[in-house]
Amino acid sequence: EKPERSNKSKPAPQTLLDILKEEKRSHVHGGIYHKIQIELTYNSNHIEGSQLTHDQTRYIFETDTIGISEEGIRVDDIIETATHFRCIDEIIENAKAPLSEKLIKHLHFILKTGTSDAKKDWFVVGDYKKLPNEVGGMETTLPENVSSEIKKLLTAYNSKENITFSVSATTRAPR
């Protein structure tokens, strides 16, 4: 009898996280990792007012460039789209760790480094806001309450036993 081969192919990844990590490593186009990067980045950036189209977001992810168009595109839109891809990678790589203020601030640091916000005296990259603001016409938590509210949120989130992640291909920001 022949000995069993030691280089048998590995079994297919079993969890969503395994699939995401494998597709990220393999640079798979059209898989769930590819879709998540584009859809989450496009929708998140549009909530914040980005004017990039879905196709432009996809193009930045796939090529690290943006085609020349007739419309002016804000540099911050391009920077935040590219850094958003890095944030999703960080989340995937840290998915097994408890969610923490340190990770949230690290993601903010990645996202905002190099943007025009980073040049503002009152804006702190990688930390909580210092001034009150609103998003989409809605009031947000006051700066002095952000840390305690985040702690409450993290305590509630990290106490959950079965945290699931679902992706809806039908829900997205208007294009």
Locate the predicted segments by residue.
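FIC/Doc superfamily catalytic core
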Residues: 1-175
